[in-house]
Amino acid sequence: MLAFPYLMTMITPPTFDVAFIGSGAACSMTLLEMADALLSSPSASPKLRIAVVERDEQFWCGIPYGQRSSIGSLAIQKLDDFADEPEKAAYRIWLEQNKQRWLAFFQAEGGAAAARWICDNRDALDGNQWGELYLPRFLFGVFLSEQMIAAIAALGERDLAEIVTIRAEAMSAHSADGHYRIGLRPSGNGPTAIAAGKVVVAIGSPPTKAILASDSEPAFTYINDFYSPGGESNVARLRDSLDRVESWEKRNVLVVGSNATSLEALYLMRHDARIRARVRSITVISRSGVLPYMICNQPPEFDFPRLRTLLCTEAIAAADLMSAIRDDLATAEERSLNLADLYDAVAALFGQALHKMDLVQQEEFFCVHGMNFTKLVRRAGRDCRQASEELAADGTLSLLAGEVLRVDACASGQPFATMTYRAAGAEHTHPVPFAAVVNCGGFEELDTCSSPFLVSAMQNGLCRPNRTNRGLLVNDDFEASPGFCVIGPLVGGNFTPKIRFWHVESAPRVRSLAKSLAASLLASLQPVALAPC
């Protein structure tokens, strides 16, 4: 694996066959699939030059599985659902063979959250029963990194590919003279631009949507992105902010959003002794006012009357399907049934309904209603979800259904925030002052995106938002324009013959897409026959 340790003074930028922008799981999985195909091909193939541009110091993991997440952060899916074969088997073997090493590290560095997780899962750990475990996410990052290091070495030994890592932020993209030119802001003495025949955009989701009107630092503690610079450092900021508040009545934390990131923040606060000792209250506000439901693996009896009635019709419209799902789940919730454990049943009925929809209505559901369906049945594992239950049980945590209108600094100049929100058609000011505000409210839409790279690529006609405005429009070969490809969350919201997803974040889904992208890239780069990915 090569890097650029020297100052690039040449006018002509270094040129590559392929440039990956972003080095997270989507990039790693695509490169691993490419490596498998190249290494198993019986035919010699021209050596590829591949660049991987990453703004953070850690390559191959991305935010969820890397150092920007807390060591204690857990996967939201148990291992049986987290990965598909053959990757699942390889991961199991790795977990078992390296258990002594990673478990000792986790115990030493993971604090109270790690100690609780190890205690709660001791029997499964001792018996190497991995399938039902919600594993620490960093483990998958280490697993991916070790696979990448081995693949890079093998490709180099066979003279099949040279993978060059470049520590820089991609700032711009345009096409010229049959190549794409990527402008870079290097960290250190790296190149300020590269050229590539093909580009793979693997930068994850758009930036977090800010909730403060001003860019200036407020007097209160404001965390706009829980993973920037990292989960551990932001928990430390919360700890310090509460330490500075003398009055116990004012040691309050506001969390905006009730998604998986919000749940993770609550989990880490619950297991931080200093935060627990000092915090008076934690308020979570979101439109639903509901956290992801706890998976208990105890499916309740429920017949889904609206959905079953709809399935008796000849043809189904997307809006009618969404309405039936919403009504049935509302009925189930009124009966105090656990929606997490109804997921498999409603997913099966959804599959039946899909077969009764024409392509126009299928696309309508995927692009208009899909994310709303996902929000209705968001789920989380016991370990992570139980922490918020415990915070609620002791009176620390309260959930509020409403839309945040603004968060302002206190007029008195004291280091506290006030929150104004809309609920039940009226505007309210929350009575509690907040020492800290954590923004977990989701990502920017692409038409108002602040990412310089995405803005440049869209302005230069290389890509455009799809119907959801959360992903980029691509064809069956993952191309937003010829040779300008997209992988990862930005593929969500596409409806093509081969790519039909409204949400692309789970590891198995990304891996399946990476397999297809790798095959497409190699087919376009290599004139020789390659083993299928």
Swiss-Prot record:
Q: Which Pfam families match?
A: NAD_binding_9
Compartment list? Cell membrane
Could you list the residue ranges that cross the membrane?
1-21, 135-155, 193-213, 472-492
Is Oxidoreductase found in the keyword set? no
GO CC aspect terms: plasma membrane
Q: How does it sit in the membrane?
A: Multi-pass membrane protein
Which UniProt key words apply to this protein? Cell membrane, Membrane, Transmembrane, Transmembrane helix
Name of the molecule in the record: Uncharacterized protein Rv3403c
